[in-house]
């Protein structure tokens, strides 16, 4: 597995927490927000499925590698514990497609409601307050466009599993990273060499563009609308969304109307777009949160943001950020 580049070993206490039922649930929640159930070529050609569990354990491993602090590493492990089925699709369902944070509100409750996890925290000398919010630990998480363990992990994970970046290249990137002080004198993951930062940012920008592509935005809104209809038809509840994807899919398939809608969703192979909404066709005009990374890199003048030392990346990142999504998007089917 690509994640073994992050650290040679993890604390047994942390590994035990990863084995609890509340964490094992994340094996059945994907990283790609339901889009992987379509027949988009990018998912059809993926190396392997990418689960929230893999990402969570990888994030914990990165935090451990750079801090060797159990509290911070466990917070990294648990940061996605409240992720619902289809992940950020539920943010679209909640009207939070621009911030995509609405599902995080259950994090503390999900931890506290797991007797196995709470017992392991107590045994490790940790409290709920220590681990319920990884935002307080800057190596684990920080504000975009800074680089954190969370952003680093899903960028490398997608680079390998979706973009077919060799594991050796991931290791080359990871081994170049160190902890430095940013503009606010706060710890941040940084690159030692500009040429490695260049490789990483090309992967990161490709990912950023994909995360807000017409295909991604359309699919997430379409699936959110399908879940909304399922709730209106009393086929599922909000709590059902916090189980796992096989459970939610089984509920959709229990209703003939929703079964047809789900089967149509699974046949989406691409999208079309235009200034006018096509008549008689399901179409959406929806914006989305733009995720991007502008890492710090070591230069002869100290640490600087990569956009200040690489004009090409600065130009491409600015172009990415300028898209206003002012177009209608609809599906192409297999």
Please tell me what each predicted stretch does.
Residues 1-71, 85, 89-334:
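Histidine-centered, transition-metal-coordinating active-site segments
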Residues 72-80:
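Short alpha-helical catalytic segment bearing the HExxH-like zincin motif
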């Amino acid at each position: 597995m690509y994640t073994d580049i992050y650290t040679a070993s993890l604390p047994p206490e942390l590994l035990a927490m990863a084995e609890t039922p509340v964490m094992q649930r994340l094996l059945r929640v994907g990283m790609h927000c339901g889009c992987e159930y379509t027949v988009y070529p990018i998912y059809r050609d993926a190396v392997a499925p990418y689960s929230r569990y893999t990402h969570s354990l990888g994030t914990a491993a990165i935090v451990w590698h750079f801090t060797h602090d159990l509290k911070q590493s466990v917070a990294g492990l648990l940061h996605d514990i409240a992720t619902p089925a289809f992940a950020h699709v539920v943010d679209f369902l909640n009207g939070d497609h621009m911030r995509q944070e609405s599902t995080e509100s259950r994090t503390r409750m999900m931890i506290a409601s797991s007797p196995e996890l709470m017992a392991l925290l107590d045994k490790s000398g940790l409290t709920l307050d220590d681990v319920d919010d990884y935002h307080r630990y800057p190596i684990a998480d920080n504000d975009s466009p800074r680089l954190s363990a969370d952003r680093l992990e899903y960028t490398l994970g997608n680079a390998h599993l979706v973009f077919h970046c060799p594991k050796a290249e991931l290791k080359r990137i990871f081994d170049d990273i160190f902890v430095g002080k940013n503009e606010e004198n706060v710890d941040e993951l940084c690159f030692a060499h500009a040429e490695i930062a260049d490789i990483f940012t090309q992967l990161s920008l490709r990912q950023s563009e994909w995360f807000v592509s017409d295909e991604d935005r359309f699919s997430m809104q379409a699936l959110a609308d399908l879940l909304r209809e399922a709730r209106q038809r009393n086929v599922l509840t909000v709590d059902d969304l916090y189980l796992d994807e096989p459970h939610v899919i089984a509920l959709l398939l229990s209703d003939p109307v929703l079964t047809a809608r789900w089967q149509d969703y699974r046949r989406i192979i691409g999208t079309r777009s235009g200034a006018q909404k096509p008549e008689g066709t399901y179409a959406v005009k929806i914006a989305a949160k733009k995720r991007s990374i502008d890492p710090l890199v070591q230069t002869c003048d100290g640490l600087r943001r990569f956009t200040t030392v690489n004009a090409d990346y600065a130009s491409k990142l600015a172009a990415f950020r300028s898209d206003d999504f002012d177009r209608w998007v609809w599906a192409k089917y297999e």
